[in-house]
Amino acid sequence: MEELIKKIEAEFTSFKQNATQLVNKGNKAAGVRSRRASSNLDKLFKEWRAVSVKAE
């Protein structure tokens, strides 16, 4: 579970950095990377939900 949390934190950091670059600098490549990161976060959150339910 701890490794999953680390993956989520890393992916969120990537999302935040790239989304900020898109908004502040208009960096289109950063927009693509931020959308990819948000998609990966969605998958990780679903995995988190499944793992946390099993842990209860």
PLM regions and their residue ranges:
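Short, charged, amphipathic alpha-helical segments
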Residues: 6, 28-37
